[in-house]
A protein has these predicted regions:
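Radical SAM enzyme [4Fe-4S]-AdoMet core and its adjacent flexible, acidic
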Residues: 2-33, 37-55, 129, 176, ...
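Conserved alpha-helical substructure of the radical SAM core
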Residues: 2-8, 13-18, 28, 42, ...
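Short cysteine/histidine-rich metal-coordination sites, predominantly Zn2+-binding motifs
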Residues: 130-138, 406-416
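Short loop/turn motifs at secondary-structure junctions and domain boundaries
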Residues: 97-98, 337-342, 393
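Secreted/processed peptides and extracellular or luminal domains of membrane proteins
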Residues: 118, 122-125, 347, 365, ...
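Short, intrinsically disordered, charge-biased short linear motifs at domain edges
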Residues: 102-107, 324-330, 348, 370-383
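Membrane-interface junctions of multi-pass transporters
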Residues: 361-407
């Protein structure tokens, strides 16, 4: 049996942002564990070979710096992105059925080395994923349409050798690998190993310039790691973006971090601070939280969002579309409607024990969506659940996926990229 929390009490249910029927459905069952291997048989990850690309490890960084500020992407890098995203997408449009994942979030850790006061997605009493579950997860995903693998936690680099082996194994099977981290453990030697293994993008999560109450993910403590990561991206062929959560107490920091990203030619991705969708037994900051947005903060947050929109209209690189940024102003006022979430259909999460769930907010749910090798995503159940949760959720990734499931949008967006030779991303999925 897994050591994940299995129950949520009635008093905890009262704190949920979902309706009572949905909460009871999500917390009243008992999910299955991943099927164990026969006694005596192990299925660990192979050791990661390093360096795989010694010519890059020893090459001068300056040789690969952009000419005239314009980064050039090689044909192999473009094809790798196509095989990761475009090919699975088109397969999902023509294959029968509803379950065709494009991206999977592999929770290799549920522990974290920091404590952000908005974050419920960790419990330092829960053991991380085993090598066997990691390998079986990747093998199973390879048998589906999925070719984008995102490590997830907690902090994914708590066991750096383990993370390196996951990345190496996944990239050798053709996955486009996405690695999010708070950057504290992302030291130069580890950057070299992960980059050599083939990480496609680093999502560097920072919410403040210097640490402040409730927001330890700051730039100052990781500045040297950040600069090394930026410098090495050109020769290894990965991208970097800053992932910033807009809270009530970091509005000036958001501007400063956005300017830093622009100065370094990288993109930014914004989230709006949300309270947990389902109450979490390990979450300790439900009351008197300095980061949660209050009604008196709305005007200042709307002003910040308008500033971000203006910067994007000037050509600053952002993952969020202008439309989605503008919707943040509606979301904080509880005015968001349904938006065709694709969780459980084209995205999913794999918990540390190998059990499945549609999305991050449902990590603690006890409803049985199956396990690796035996998924049980039910279209009717997902539709009923999303009727309650969609208006209460501001998932950036699933909203982008929702926009993709409009063929006209995709064709127009791909045509725009093709006109520029697929040299970087031009515009958002509008």
């Amino acid at each position: 049996m897994s050591d994940l929390p299995r129950t949520i009490t009635a008093s905890q249910n009262n704190a949920s942002r979902l309706d009572t029927v949905t909460v009871e459905q999500l917390t009243g069952g008992e999910r299955a564990d991943a099927v164990t291997l026969p006694t005596g048989k192990r299925h660990p990850l192979p050791n990661a070979h390093f360096p795989r690309r010694p010519e890059l490890l020893w090459a001068a960084d300056e040789k690969y710096f952009p000419t005239n500020g314009h980064r050039r992407w090689k044909a192999g890098e473009i094809l790798h992105a196509m095989h990761g995203w475009a090919v699975p997408f088109f397969k999902s449009r023509v294959l029968p059925g509803d379950f065709h994942p494009l991206i999977a979030y592999l929770f290799n850790e549920w522990k974290c080395n920091l404590e952000c006061h908005y974050c419920w997605a960790y419990d330092n009493h829960v053991k991380g994923m085993t090598e066997e579950v990691a390998r079986r997860s990747i093998d199973w995903l390879h048998s589906t349409t999925c070719r984008v693998l995102a490590l997830m936690g907690g902090e994914v680099l708590l066991r750096p050798d383990f993370a390196h082996r996951i990345v190496d194994y996944a990239t050798q099977k053709g996955f486009w690998v996405y690695l999010p981290t708070n950057g504290r453990l992302l030291r130069p030697d580890l950057i070299d190993r992960l980059a050599d293994a083939g990480v496609a993008t680093f999502n560097l999560a920072v919410d403040a310039w210097e640490e402040k109450p409730g927001l330890p993910k700051a730039m100052v403590p990781i500045r040297k790691n950040f600069e090394y990561l930026i410098r090495k991206q050109y020769k290894y062929g990965y991208t970097v973006f800053l992932n910033i959560n807009i809270c009530r107490n970091n509005l000036d920091d958001v501007r400063q971090l956005t300017e830093l990203a622009h100065e370094n030619g990288i993109a930014t991705d914004y989230h709006i601070c949300e309270e947990p969708m389902l109450s979490q037994a390990s979450f300790r900051h439900a009351e008197n939280n300095p980061v949660f947005i209050r009604e008196e903060d709305h005007a200042a947050i709307c002003e910040l969002i308008d500033w971000l929109i203006a910067r994007q209209n000037e050509g600053w690189h952002m993952v969020n579309s202008v439309e989605r940024l503008a919707q943040m102003k509606s979301f904080i006022k509880h005015e968001i409607d349904h938006w065709n979430c694709r969780a459980g259909q084209n995205s999913l999460i794999i918990r540390v024990d190998g059990s499945l769930a549609p999305c991050f907010p449902t990590y603690s749910a006890t409803y049985d969506w199956g396990t690796i090798e035996n998924p049980k995503m039910d279209a009717k159940q997902l539709q009923e659940m999303k009727h309650s949760c969609e208006p209460n959720c501001f998932s950036t990734l699933n909203h982008i996926l929702a926009f993709c499931y409009n063929d006209g949008r995709v064709i127009r967006w791909l045509a725009k990229q093709a006109m520029h030779g697929f040299q970087g991303i031009r515009g958002n999925m509008e």
